[in-house]
Amino acid sequence: MSLAVCIILSGDYHYALSKSPDRHPTNEEVYREIGYETIDKALQEFAAHFNQGIELPLRTPPISFTHTLGRFNDLDGEDKDSLEIKYINEKLPDNHYKITVRPVEHRFPFKEEEVIKVIKLQDGEEAVYLDRDGFNVLSFERGYWQYTLSINKRASDLMLPGVLVQIANSIEFATEES
């Protein structure tokens, strides 16, 4: 009993709880452990690394999310560096949406057999709608960046590619406002 009081008084109560073998880590702890942080912080790190400004879409899919997270992946060589923005719902695991951004010069390739269709965006550029690993994906280029919007197929069964296109087009609006 006195050990518990010492832990509480020393301010290490939260730490002691988090290291308990009977306690499961929270989503926040798990994501923090693998490098996720606030979207703003990840955006700043990514933009500073490439010395380029970046805009994110203003829109999100019309499904509910409980968490928004960001991670700048600074890996070996700039060709592997990317920004990941995740939107998840801890109560509905199928509600998983991700934005990945990388420089156009290091664009992520895709296979022709993955392409469902090519769609023209509002700015006249083409986007590729893909079926990849259980996700519906829209990949397009805007300025210096390649954007890849991915949404879990189980969450997007009722959504047409038009939803991802609306999200992609909302970057143009954000750019005009800057």
Predicted regions and their residues:
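Sec-dependent N-terminal signal peptides of Gram-positive bacterial secreted proteins and lipoproteins
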Residues: 1-18
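Generic hydrophobic/packing signal
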Residues: 12, 125-126, 164
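Short, solvent-exposed recognition patches
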Residues: 21-137, 142-143
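A sequence-composition feature that detects small, non-aromatic residues
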Residues: 4, 16, 42, 47-48, ...
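Surface-exposed amphipathic alpha-helical segments
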Residues: 148-178
